[in-house]
A protein has these predicted regions:
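Glycine-rich FAD pyrophosphate-binding loop
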Residues: 11-13, 24-47
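C-terminal helical "tail/cap" subdomain of flavin- and related membrane-associated enzymes
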Residues: 289-372
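Conserved Rossmann-like nucleotide-cofactor binding loop
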Residues: 18, 41, 151
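A conserved beta-strand/loop capping segment in the N-terminal third of enzymes
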Residues: 56-106
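Beta1/beta-strand and adjacent pyrophosphate-binding region of the FAD-binding site
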Residues: 2-18
Length: 372
């Protein structure tokens, strides 16, 4: 039997990664927190299932522990385009490939440890001036946090829909039973699409195709990459294909009155960055501090700051998607000068400054392209 409280300090709409991270961070600040989601756990979501070192550090600040048998460590990135390939290790530790459901279970465990109230199978019907409405009545609260994803109803109810920019791509994911052949997250670049490959277990890989074509599926995309197709064609599937929209969205505001947004509900970057989870973890920590300090403007400022590096890296990486000419020259240049790619990877995970990135990556890369 689900017991719904009549009152709580903060009510979080959405029990995915952002909602649970928010609950954990807010409980650490002493707030009473209730989370509601219409789904039953563990909640799955289509993504590349790779956590970079900085995302793992954010999880650590939330006190979340991943079980060793549930993740596979990877050392960096590898880009592949035709015959050209380049890889680089993270300068600040290893990443972790992990099934989204295992991550969700770890977040649930931590949220329960902190004393958050979790309501599963409970949809939120709307907002009131003093709380939220459920099927069973109204829950009074001081703050409502919308953590209900890309198509956030809370964002719509609060009048926060106005976006400064928006673009869409489409992703389709499948898991394969196969021993990882790589210790990197691999991105295969093709004409109009990319395929991301993440080792997530000793006998399992996560494979995602991303494109602007909502009809392009893995079965059509994989033959475009003969080497990868050859590795996977005889591997058994461990999941059915699952799709999702990857949006690049910047909102004009992330709070209004007593309603705040976090995670994809508050804006998002393209999945090519692999930064969505880190962003929601860091946003949750910033949100908790701002509410503890009773300073919503500080949350808005922190939110903008957190989004800058991922937005820049997404724009940089997606420029390769727009132009085959540029993509081939960049990949050839990176292959011949791996130190340039190493600086890009360092920037990607927050281990290099903008000045370092321009001096050690962008300027040398530009010279290579012009000389090609």
């Amino acid at each position: 039997m689900i017991i719904i409280p009549k009152q709580t300090d903060i009510f979080i709409v959405g029990g995915g990664s952002a909602g649970l991270a928010g609950a954990i961070a807010l409980r650490a600040r002493g707030f009473g927190v209730t989370v509601a989601d219409p789904a039953l756990p563990p909640i799955d979501k289509t993504c590349g299932e790779g956590l970079m070192p900085d995302a793992l550090a954010s999880l650590g600040r939330l006190g979340v522990t991943l079980r060793p048998e549930h993740f596979f460590p990877f050392r960096g990135f590898r880009f592949v385009s035709g015959r050209a390939s380049v890889d680089a290790s993270f300068p600040n530790g290893t990443g972790a490939g992990i099934r989204r459901t295992h991550l969700h279970e770890a977040l649930i465990d931590r949220a329960q440890e902190t004393g958050a109230t979790l309501l599963w199978g409970v949809p939120v019907k709307g907002l009131t001036k003093t709380g939220v409405t459920l099927d069973g009545g109204t829950v009074e609260c001081r703050w409502v946090v919308g953590a209900d994803g890309e198509n956030s109803r809370v964002r719509r109810w609060a009048g926060l829909e106005s976006a400064r920019s928006k673009s869409l791509r489409f992703g389709f994911r499948r898991h394969y039973r196969i021993t990882p052949w790589t210790d990197c997250v691999e991105i295969y670049w093709g004409s109009g699409c990319q395929i991301y490959v993440t080792p997530i277990g000793h006998e399992e890989m996560c494979v995602v195709v991303m494109s602007r074509d909502s009809h392009l599926r893995l079965d059509q995309a994989l033959p475009m990459f003969p080497e990868l197709f050859g590795r996977l064609k005889n591997a058994a599937w461990t999941s059915t294909e699952r799709g999702a929209v990857s949006a690049t969205r910047r909102l004009a505001r992330v709070y209004s009155g007593h309603v705040l947004l976090v995670g994809d509900a508050s804006g998002s970057v393209d999945a090519i960055t692999g930064e969505g989870l880190r962003l929601c973890f860091e946003q949750s920590l910033a949100l908790a501090k701002a509410l503890s300090d009773d300073n919503l403007k500080a949350y808005a400022a922190a939110h903008r700051q957190l989004a800058r590096r991922p937005a820049f890296m997404a724009a940089l990486m997606l420029s390769l998607d727009h132009s085959a000419w540029l993509r081939q020259r960049v990949l050839r240049a990176l292959s011949s000068e791996p130190r340039i790619f190493a600086t890009q990877v360092a920037m990607h995970v927050g281990a290099a400054t903008t000045t370092d990135f321009i001096r050690r990556s962008m300027l040398p890369l530009g010279r290579h392209i012009l000389a090609a």
